[in-house]
């Protein structure tokens, strides 16, 4: 009996041991499965601490501005990275076809490059919530016969960027208009094509409405003929795969920024009116000499004297920046009377950028610093004009333009030569070889010219202010220009680009 009991106990213990061992095996296996589970893309991004975005360096995507990297796509991608709690890394791929092929690979988690949602592209990638609608616009040269229909393109030289939504649209139109022909180039950008139309090298091109709006001041003869498409969505591109974790998070992100209005602020910053100076703006400046300048004249003179500057030049610079508004604020981050970035304010010791006196003294110190950091061999007045350009576009971009100037046989120390090359910083075939990349170089040229003209008017105003007041009261004058002396009249005309009344 005892033997039977011992055998039974042994059998039970053996079974319990086997069950325990089996349980341990299952536990280890389960732990192994959990530890070996492939993380989602979203988890991978968060654990690595970095979001990699594919884009193109350019005016509607991202570029290096005076305050650092900027551009609509860059700002949105930066906000998404912040939403995820990670850093942003932008990687450039210039060819649009290659860009879409590499979405979701090691090249990048997503593509944010002003991509138009098309049927063909939607078969390759997964598009997120659209953030903007654009139309494709046919561009022709002002002064030439304006095309009214697609048939008007027959026999003409039409050029577009290869692998673009514009080439897709032309292929769609060709099904109905069989005689439609065009050229595709992969080594040109939108600004190149606008220049070709402007100079009459090609008859027509196609650009997106948002891109045209940003760049129309550069080549004013390149004009819209008509919309060649219905409104189309722009969106970010994600890979088509089962793991949609990052895509879903992006959908939540866009929903949030639309509700908070953050996306509207970005739209206004990058796609709002460019602020070209026209006749009315020039006249407004002339009147603000009387209404605003006197309030700040004492501070401007003191700051200029302390930094060995021309106070009238400092006044002209500050008007160009803020219109003498101490509370001026830009969505890009510059603020105050001298529109200082946060980093620049810290550099020159400004604690409150909205304090006009601090801003004036800080702006004067910053301009003096830029003036002094230029090569010693540069003489006046070129030194001042180049320093003004640096205040607008940054020393890095200015140096890029000076290198280009020397490359093309010009004098990098002469403003007259450098200003000819500054617009090249907006053209891919040039800026892709520069250290600091894309910049809206033509704006720096206009910026300096405006300040020089403002300076002329302020200098004249200092001498003949009383006479101007008397002339302004004369009811017999037939135009606003006639309220001022010939000197002021010509300066105002120069600013506004008006040659006759």
UniProtKB/Swiss-Prot annotation:
Say if the entry is tagged with keyword Lyase. Answer: yes
InterPro entries in alphabetical order: Lysozyme-like_dom_sf, MltF, Solute-binding_3/MltF_N, Transglycosylase_SLT_dom_1
Q: Name one GO biological process term.
A: cell wall organization
Primary enzyme class:
lyase
What's an example GO cellular component term for this entry?
A: cell outer membrane
Q: Which residues form the active site?
A: 321
Pfam families reported for this sequence? SBP_bac_3, SLT
Q: Which SMART domains match?
A: PBPb (SM00062)
Location of the protein in the cell:
Cell outer membrane
Q: What span is annotated as the signal peptide, if there is one?
A: 1-29
Protein name according to UniProt: Membrane-bound lytic murein transglycosylase F
